[in-house]
Structures are given as C-alpha cells and as structure tokens.
Swiss-Prot record:
PROSITE patterns: DEAH_ATP_HELICASE (PS00690), HELICASE_ATP_BIND_1 (PS51192), HELICASE_CTER (PS51194). The gene is prp16. It comes from Schizosaccharomyces pombe (strain 972 / ATCC 24843). This is Pre-mRNA-splicing factor ATP-dependent RNA helicase prp16. Residues 153-165, 175-191, 234-248, 270-279 have a biased composition (Basic and acidic residues). Belongs to the DEAD box helicase family. DEAH subfamily. PRP16 sub-subfamily. Residues 193-209 have a biased composition (Low complexity). Residues 687-862 form the Helicase C-terminal domain. Coiled coil: none annotated.
C-alpha cells in the first residue's frame, strides 16, 4: 500500500513546479491547494490548462505536468482517506480569495450585556413565536451566533464555484475513514462522529432517498415563508437547493461566514447543454475577475485582459475604433512641439527631484544609517621641502598701481548707472510678468498672445552668418578696390624703408622692429625676407599672439604674392594646420612654435623667426623669448626679428643684450588729447554725456568708445539712444556695439559705411585697440578701464577684474583717432591720474596666470630647475611652486620633481594638464569617445548665445540640454544633438547656439583623434555616463567643493565659499549634491564655479589620495562599525623613502673628488654667406 510520505513528496514537487512562476514559495504553497481543487473538477488536461492560465502564463507542457501531479495526489488522497486539510501546508479548508493565516490576535467583540434584562426578554419573545410556528428558529439563530464567534479565527472569503461541482460530487466511504483512523486530525474525528450521530435519525426515508432528505433538511432549516418587520409573510427565502457547494461540503449548520452563491433560475433555458455551457462561462468569468486582484502576476499588468477569451472579433473592432476616435489628432509640427515639451517637462521633474531618472536604484532600509565624512590632509613631496607656497602675499602682484587711487576705487565700485538700470529692468520684468494676461482665461478671450511665443516663431528663422570673404568685402575701402596689390604694397610706409631694413637684418642676428599699426610690418617683413632669398636655408616663420590674426595675415600675404594658401604661404594654429611640403612662409601662433620646440630643440627647419606683436606680452611669447635666447647661442645661422610698438621696445632690446632697434615711420595724423578736469565717479555716465556732446557740437566724423565688457556696452548703447530720443530734432546717430561673444554677422556691421548725413558711434572693448581697424574714426572716448584676468595662486582661482589700463594702452587707444585724418581723444580721467595711477605697460600675462602647462612644457624641454629659467619678467615664486605641486598631485611629476611616464604623455597634448590627463585616463575606462568630445567643448568659448531681448527664450532653450548631475555631460549632450541634426546652422540658431564655436569644437575633436592615433590610443564609447563622471573626477579632484547650508558650497582644501551659477544644470535642483568638481572658479561679484559635476566621495579618495580620505560610519539593526579608506600611509612611506634616497645621493655626490679635465678650445665656424647679404 502507498505510504503517506509519497503523498508529501508529490505535493512538494507540485509546489516546486509552481515556484517557477510565483514570486515566492509561500505564494506557490497557497496556490497548490487551489490547483488541486481545479484538477478535481476538470475532466481533461485541456480544460485544466485553460483554468490554470488565470493564475499566470503557464506553458502547455508545464500545465500537463502539473495536471498529472494533481491527479496522482488526488488518487493517493482517495486511497489513503486523507482530507485536503491534512495535506502539507494546509491547516484548514482552502478557499479562494483573501485568507487570514494568523488570526490568533483577532477576536470578535463580545456582545454587551443589558443591565435591564432586555436581551433576555427578546430571546423569550422569539422563542414563543417559533413555538407558535412549530419551528425552532431560536435554536438555529443561537447556533449561528455561537459558530460565528467560535470560528472567528477561520474567516474565509467566498471562493468562485467550480463549473463541474454541481454535476460531480464524490462521496466519502466510511470504510476508508475507519481503516485509516490513525491519519485523522481532531477536526476530522469530530465531523465523522457528527455524521455518524445524524445518520440514524436524518437518513430514514420511506422512498429510500435518505441522502436527499438529509440535504433538504440541512439546506432548508428555516421556513420558506417568514414574516418581515411589518408582520406579513411576503418575505421568502430563495430555494436553498439551488445553492452550490464544493466537493468538500462541511456537514453541519450554516454560519454567518459560510460562502453562499445564489443562483437565480433562468426564465426559459433552451436546453440543459446551454445551461451547462452558461454556468461554465460564468464560473470562468468569476475566477478571472477575482484573480485579477491577486498579487501574483496580474497586479498592475494592464496588458492582460481576463475577458479576452469571451470577446468576439466585432467587439475588438468596435473597441479599437472607439480608442482611435478618442485620440487627439495632431499635425507633424504640433507633434514635434508636443514631444519637445514633454521632454522638457520630464527633464524639469527629474531636475526638481519629483521623479526619478530611469535606471536609478532607490532601495534602502529605513533602519539603516550610513554617514560618509571626507577628511582633508595635504601631502607634500620632498622636492618641495622648504618651499613657501605663500611666501609672497597675494597683494604683491596687483593689477593697479595705487589701490587707494580714484581709478582703483571707481573700478571696484563699478558704474552706478549700469547697476540702477539693471535693477530697474528686473523690477519691470517682474511687474510685467505678474500683470500679464497672456495665457490666462481672460487673455484667451481677449485674444492676447504671449510675447515669448512670437519671439519663438521669429527665432526659428536661421540667422545667416557672414563668412570671411563677405566680411572682407565690407571692409574694403575705395583705395583697396581701385588699386592693385602691387600699388597697395608700395603705398605702405614699410615699403619705403625696404633696403635699409634688409641691410640692418644682414648685419645683426637679432633686430627689434618698431612700427605703428598699419605701417605694414606684419605683411611685408616676411615678403622682404622671401624676396631676399632667406627661404633657401629654411622656412620663414612668423608668430602671432592670436589665431585669427595668423589666419587673416596668411590669407592676405598669399593674395599679394599670387599663390594658393597652403602652398608657398600657409598657417598653423592649434588643432588646424594649412601647410604643405612647399611652404616657405609660415604664419602661426606662438603656442604652435612652442610645441614645435619640444620636437626640435634648435628649430633646425627655420632660418628666420619673426615674433610679431611682441608688445602684448602673452604667456607663450615670454616663454619663447627665453627659449630663443638659448637657441641663438647654439645656432649662429638663425635670425630673430621682434616687432613691437613704441611702448616697450627698449625692454626687448635689453633682454637680447642690447639688440639694435629699427623704426618704421608711421603715417598717422596728429591727435589732440583732452583730459578730464576732475575725476568722474561713473565712467558710463561720463561716456554717454561725452558722446552726445560730440554728436551735437563737433564736425562730422565717427566716434569710437572703449568700454569694459558686454553689460557696460549694451547699457551705454541703450542710454545713448534713449537720451537722444528725448531731444527735439536731433541729428541721426547709428549706434553699433561690438564684443567677443557677439555673432560674426553682427560684428561685421561696424565696417559698413554710414548713410549720408548719419554719424556712426562704435562702442567696443579693448578688442578695437589692435585687432580691429575701423575706418573713418575721428573721435575716441577713453574711459580708462578694461577687464583683466588675474590668477590667485593661494586660492587657485581666476578673477576677472575691472582695472585701470596702462599708459601704453591709453596711447594705443588715442592713436585710433588719427588713422584717416586729424582727430581728438577724450580721456575721462585727469592727467595726474594718467601719470601717477597707471602702469607704463600692461602687466605681463606670465605674472597673472596659472603656469601649470608652462611648467610641464619646460620640464619636457629638459629644464630641471624652473627657477633658473631666463624669464623676461620673473613670475611670482608662489605661482611656480603651486604649479609644481599641482603637477605632482596629477601624477605628472614624481617625488624627485622629474617627469613621469604619465607626464610625458600629457605634454604631447596641446592643452591644460587636467584635460590631457582626462584623455589618457579615459583609455583605461573605455570612454575616450565621450571624453574627447567634452575636452573639445571645454577648449572653446561658451557655445551659448544669450541676446538681451530674448534672454528668457534663450534660457528655456538651454534648459532642454540640461543633465541634472553634470554640466560636462550637458556639453556632451549638446554636441551629440548637434551631430544627430547633421551639424545644421539653422538648428544652432533655433537653440541659441554659436554654430561657429561648435564647428571649432568639431575641428579640435578631429585633431585630438589624430593625436590619439599617433599615441595608439583607441576610440571607445560607453553607455553609462557614471563612468564618464568617474573619469572627470580623476583629473579634477583638486578642484572639489562640498555642500554647506542651503545653496552654498565651500572649497574642500581652502574653505573658501563657492556658488553655483544660475546657468548650471545643478542650479535649481530639488537637492544639492554633497560633493562636486568644477572646471574653473571665476571671481566676479561672487565666487562662481564654472562647469560643475557631482561626484561620489569615494571617487575623490580613490583618485586624490594626496588630499582626501573617507571615514564611513555604518549602523543598522544588526551591526555598527567605522571604516576609513585612505592611501595616506602608503604615500607617506614612499615620500619618506625617496627623501632618504635623495639625501644619500647628494651626500655621495659631495664626497666624490673633483677631477680636473683638460679644457679643449673649439673654434666656431663662421656663418654661411647667403646670396644677397
């Protein structure tokens, strides 16, 4: 005979099979009993499979296997006489619906006892009424009440009926129960004894239908006619024989918790088969309906339709047609606009923290507490022992001559007129936004439209950007259009002294050429040397401080020589090389020549080097001066020409050992200088008054006004126009602004000639001093201020300050009034301020900028001691030490101060050390594609264009590209969108982006790809942008800040407060990241972080071990511990070991005997004579 263990084993297999489709084993155990019930009422495996599909998407093979297991269990149950309650995992009767497994804590409310005995009286009256009717109604009510209270812990909801339970009802055999009493539970014994006690009295019948009589008595304990509350007998019970029960009918009186299904008889069923089919469909629908609320696999599953089996094709067609009619029909333009707005709304919700970005984990335990503290402790290598990072105070190198002078004080205060106008515009804007009816219900009725919508429609029209050829045509004068290139050359002042100049060049290795702007020294010197044959021994190189100048001059010289650009004459700038094997005249930026010196220390391929515009004293120019001075001592056959204005030519001559100076006479007209009688407190107000006074009282002639920046220029133009409109019958005036961030097509307007009878006024920055020449200028208004970028080595930030100009700048500005005729220069400061409060020359860039890249280049050139390098103007010592320390922290220098392998790779990229390290580290993380895109975007000016009249629309367009956790990723996002739109100019205009700047970034990216291919660095891409943020942290960990308070950050190492700019993607978030890194820190009105990315503190400790260590404190309900992640012990040990090794080497070197070597005299070879010398 089969054992009870086999039945348990089969039931366990059934549970294991169901576990594959359930979320947990408990759910499978609960489902197993329901599946057994379905199997008992199923006549075939197909019917069982259809019923099983309501619990989940079971496969057909698994359904057949489950059906076989259920039949085996049912067979064992029949043979062993084990009830379903006795099966494993079942403590009571299994029913569908909600089952309370643990009800020990639930107890029914005890009936309140009446103090007046009314409850006893009510029971007696009910008993009397039942005796009159001949029925024991009271006993039935009491039994129901007792059973409902006693079985409260077995509360079960109604289970959907089995479609076959009415037609199939297995009877239990008494013999099977008696033979296996050892397996019976207490409940089974109680029910068996009750059944035995009732069988003798309740199953006796004259016609032999004992079972039917029993069921009638048990199912109809009450009369079908009962009185209602009004005493009549119209209330009837439904025929209880129509009740449906399952196969495991619990014999006994009904309780108030029994599951009853009322079936109402149909009026006229067609046939018994139709009724059976209808009952099966109803049972199936009931099961689908109830199971739809189960939490197994259908909760939240909106795709599954439990009534799909009963739908007809016509129903589905009607439903699809109805859904299609409900859809909102949109045009293609409206659909694109709706999609764009949806993306913006989703981005805003993610940014504000209302919704989560996809793929972010949010699982955490409420009982878990984790705190991470970032500890800061700077380490220093031994080669910097004794070096004072702050040996000089920050104020030693200042941009003003006298901090207490009137010019310095007014520069710090700024313009009061501009400040008041800014505040007034903000108040006006807020008031108009508050009182605007556009977009409201009343505004819609009145037909008012939002001005931003109209601006948006106007902004969709692409703006045509003028090319260089178009701009050059606009700049052509009548003289240039009527004269040939030969005649134009002969008209220049430099052509008149051609022979004398060549004679001095032949006799001297170094020559300082002094000439005013427009004398022709830039374009003619290289042609003079070419015509004299210097190109036969090597190329003639000409350096320019700006790349635009190098490109334009090369184009002009190639046109004058009648050759194609890139053949005989070419140019080379960073990330762009337009030269060929036949190029003999090469124009380039000074940085390009500095990079070439890394490959060729002696510059062998050049015979003559011309350093143009050296008076601007750029950083690379000063470094080249020191390098060329050494090259000249090693090569006697190379010549150096340094062109400069009259301002500091003597300093260049002294640096090169008293080199001769050659002056090219200028062709400028006399300029009268007019100083102010008293200092002016507001330079914008004074400039506006002076322009109006010139326009109303002076003869014809255009006006040039020098201002500090974009905001001052725009305010000056608006105020001049407003005040001129207040005058009656005032002469016409054309007001044109120009600054670096203005689009090229708008910049070209200043070169257009004004209409007859109209005076032109140009308001510009110091870009109009040397870079641009505007014809027709007769009056110059000099405010005496400019914006200068200063580097604070103690804080490691660049500050953009409004500072007084130098005397050399003032003379250069005044000279702009005498290009076409006599002019007047109005200086809005006193003559004493010019003499006492201004420097003679502008502060060199090498003394006010970060020198990390410069030091890296010098180390690559073999300069061991940076302090011993021959600088024309020595940079501050603290700046040099800070640059060396930064390179050591980045891994470019070792503990001895020598270049590492990483540092050599970094020096090959023409960019800042941090950006170079980004590309190198990206190879290890396989994200070079994304990193070089970010680096190229960081290497160009801002790509955003924000016109003052459409500022809000520009800001809204910028927000569409925001990435909540990173501004670096925002730049990557912009470039990728531009790339997907085919590098379209119209797309850039629509989204307020500089197409020219983006194209420049694309060229830089292509050049980086070529450099990487030479270094054998592969291009790879990743989809996880967290990896990109991790790589960014590896290069910018020294520029990190942590959150403090609300909306404020502090620098981790210096403790200086930092702020997010309003244009940052992180600004306006619903939360502030704890730790961020930034690209640069700019000090204007506040300390603003530019290009910010949120990072993890563990990343900072991983890559910046010289600065940071992480202390983690963890607590939950089971454990608590503190952990510290730090690489400081290993770094300290390595620094100490290297310090001891260096000390031993120095001691051994000092103890070595000095060996005297015989000096050998080497006779220098005379330089070769070239034809024409």
């Amino acid at each position: 005979m089969l054992s009870h263990n086999q039945n348990d084993l089969l039931f366990t297999k059934l549970i294991d099979k169901l576990t594959d489709y359930m979320s947990s084993k408990d759910a499978a155990t609960s489902l197993a009993s329901r599946v057994l019930t379905i199997a008992k009422g199923s006549s075939s495996s197909t019917e069982f499979s259809n019923a099983l599909h309501t619990f989940g998407r079971f496969s057909d093979n698994d359904s057949v296997l489950i059906y076989d297991l259920c039949k085996s269990i049912i067979g064992l149950e029949t043979n062993l006489g084990i009830s379903k309650d006795k099966l494993p995992g079942n403590d009571g009767s299994q029913v569908a619906g909600l089952v309370l497994s643990n009800r020990s804590g639930l107890k029914g409310r005890e009936p309140k006892k009446s103090q007046l005995g009314l409850d006893v009286l009510a029971v007696q009256k009910k008993k009397e009424k039942s005796q009159v009717e001949g029925r024991s109604e009271l006993s039935q009510v009491e039994n129901d009440s007792l059973e409902s209270i006693g079985n409260y812990d077995r509360v079960e909801f109604k289970r959907p009926k089995n479609p076959h339970e009415k037609h199939f009802r297995p009877l239990r055999q008494r013999s099977s129960v008696d033979d296996h009493q050892e397996f019976e539970s207490e409940d089974d014994k109680y029910r068996r004894n009750s059944y035995s006690s009732w069988s003798g009295s309740n199953f006796e019948s004259s016609n032999g239908s004992n079972r039917r009589r029993y069921r009638t008595q048990m199912e109809e304990p009450l009369s079908s006619k009962r009185r209602n509350r009004f005493g009549n007998g119209s209330r009837r019970d439904v025929d209880s024989s129509k009740y449906s029960h399952d196969s495991d009918y619990s014999y006994g009186a009904h309780s108030s918790w029994d599951a009853r299904d009322v079936e109402y008889p149909e009026e006229d069923p067609e046939s018994k088969a139709d009724r059976q089919r209808w009952e099966e469909e109803q049972a199936h629908l009931d099961r689908d309906w109830y199971m739809n609320s189960e939490s197994q696999n259908l909760l939240g599953d909106e795709v599954h339709n439990p009534f799909s089996d009963f739908e007809t094709v016509e129903d589905r067609a009607h439903e699809a047609e109805f859904i299609e009619k409900q859809k909102k029909h949109l045009s293609i333009e409206a659909s694109d606009r709706f999609k764009e707005n949806s993306m913006w709304e989703k981005n805003r919700m993610i940014t504000s923290g209302v919704s989560k970005a996809p793929g972010l984990e949010s699982d955490y335990s409420l009982m878990e507490e984790r705190r991470v503290h970032l500890l800061v402790d700077e380490l220093r290598p031994h080669f910097l022992d004794g070096a004072e990072f702050s040996s000089k105070k920050v104020g030693d190198i200042t941009s003003v001559r006298d901090p207490q002078s009137d010019l310095a004080i007014n520069a710090r205060l700024g313009s009061r007129l501009v400040r008041e106008r800014r505040e007034f515009r903000e108040r006006q804007k807020a008031a108009s936004a508050a009182t605007s009816l556009a977009g409201t219900s009343l505004g819609n009725v009145m037909g008012l439209k939002d001005s931003n919508d109209e601006d948006a429609k106007a902004g969709t029209t692409p703006v045509k950007v003028a090319g260089r050829s178009e701009q050059s045509n606009k700049k052509d004068t009548e003289f240039a259009r009527t004269k040939s290139y030969r005649e134009q050359r002969e008209f220049l002042p430099a052509f008149a002294v051609r022979e004398q100049l060549l004679s001095v060049i032949r006799d001297n290795q170094v020559l300082i050429v002094v000439g005013e702007t427009g004398s022709g020294k830039t374009t003619q010197l290289a042609q003079f040397l070419y015509e004299d044959g210097y190109h036969r021994n090597g190329m003639i190189g000409c350096t320019q401080p700006r790349r635009v100048a190098a490109m334009s001059v090369a184009k002009r010289v190639s046109e004058e020589m009648g050759v194609r650009l890139g053949s005989t004459v070419g140019y080379s700038i960073r990330f762009e090389d337009v030269t060929g094997p036949d190029t003999v005249i090469k124009y380039m930026t000074d940085g390009v020549l500095l990079r070439e010196s890394l490959m060729q220390n002696n510059l062998e391929k050049y015979s003559v080097i011309i350093m143009d515009e050296a008076h601007e004293r750029s950083l690379n120019t000063d470094i080249l001066m020191g390098l060329l001075k050494k090259v000249l001592s090693r090569r006697r056959d190379i010549k150096l020409l340094v062109t400069s204005a009259t301002m500091n030519s003597q300093k260049f001559s002294d640096f090169f050992g008293g080199a001769p100076q050659f002056t090219i006479p200028g062709r400028t007209y006399p300029v009268d200088i007019m100083f102010a009688k008293a200092p002016c407190s507001d330079y914008v107000e004074a400039a506006v008054r002076q322009v109006l006074q010139i326009h109303l009282s002076q003869p014809a002639g255009d006006i040039l006004v020098f201002m500090t920046g974009q905001e001052d220029i725009e305010a000056t133009c608006e105020i001049i126009a407003d005040r001129l409109n207040q005058l009656h019958d005032a002469p016409r005036l054309s007001i044109l602004p120009i600054y670096s961030q203005m689009p090229a097509d708008l910049q070209a307007k200043i070169f257009d000639s004004a209409e007859p009878g109209v005076r032109k006024v140009v308001v510009a920055t110091n870009i109009a001093e040397t870079s641009l020449t505007v014809h027709g200028i007769s009056y110059v208004v000099d405010t005496g201020y400019c914006k200068l970028k200063m580097y604070n080595s103690k804080l490691g930030i660049d500050t953009l300050q409004v500072t007084p100009i130098s005397q050399a700048n003032a003379n250069q500005r005044a000279g702009r009034a005498g290009r076409t005729g006599p002019g007047i220069a109005y200086r809005l400061y006193t003559e004493m301020a010019y003499i006492r409060e201004m420097f003679e020359t502008t502060l060199p860039e090498i003394q006010r900028t970060n020198l990390s890249n410069t030091v890296l280049i010098l180390k690559s050139l073999g300069v061991e001691e940076i302090s011993d390098f021959d600088f024309m103007d020595r940079p501050p010592n603290d700046t040099l030490m800070a640059s060396l320390y930064e390179l050591w922290t980045l891994g470019a220098l070792d503990n001895f101060g020598k270049l590492t392998t990483l540092g050599k790779k970094m020096s090959l990229f023409p960019m800042d050390p941090s950006l170079s390290k980004l590309i190198i580290i990206a190879e290890d993380y396989k994200c070079t594609e994304e990193i070089i895109t970010i680096v190229s975007m960081l290497s160009v000016p801002s790509v955003f264009y924000r016109p003052k009249e459409r500022a809000e629309e520009s800001d809204a367009a910028r927000e569409k590209f925001n990435v909540p956790e990173s501004d670096h990723l925002m730049l990557l996002n912009i470039y990728q969108h531009w790339q997907r739109n085919g590098y379209s100019n119209s797309w850039c205009s629509k989204h307020f982006l500089h197409s020219k700047t983006l194209k420049r970034a694309r060229d830089i990216r292509q050049q980086l790809v070529e450099i990487m291919s030479k270094q054998k660095i592969s291009l790879e891409s990743v989809s996880d942008w967290d990896i990109v943020r991790r790589v960014l942290c590896s290069a910018y960990f020294h520029q990190a800040a942590c959150a403090k308070g609300i909306g404020e950050y502090v620098h981790l190492r210096s403790g200086m407060p930092c702020h997010l700019h309003v244009t940052s993607s992180l600004y306006g978030l619903g939360y502030l990241p704890d730790y961020v890194i930034y690209h640069e820190l700019v000090l204007t009105s506040k300390e603003y972080m530019n290009i910010v990315t949120s990072v993890d503190p563990y990343w900072l400790a991983e890559f910046g071990g010289v600065y940071y260590s992480v202390k983690e404190r963890f607590r939950n309900e089971t454990e608590s511990y503190d952990r510290v992640f730090s690489s400081k012990p290993q770094l300290d040990a390595q620094i100490a070991a290297d310090r001891e090794l260096d000390a031993k080497q120095k001691l051994a070197k000092n103890q070595e005997p000095v060996k005297s070597k015989r000096k050998s005299v080497i006779r220098a070879k005379p330089p070769r004579r070239v034809r024409g010398f």
